[in-house]
């Protein structure tokens, strides 16, 4: 099973690629926003996991 951090990281990459391929500006903006949101979630999951291990 894929971890949350890995899933969010993968989705961030997918959305960045979609943003680069988008034809319209609204689509590019939307995919870039999703990429940013998924990247933040991946970072949060990683930080939470590190905190749990060191506690």
Label every model-predicted segment.
Residues 1-55:
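Long, non-catalytic architectural segments outside compact domain cores
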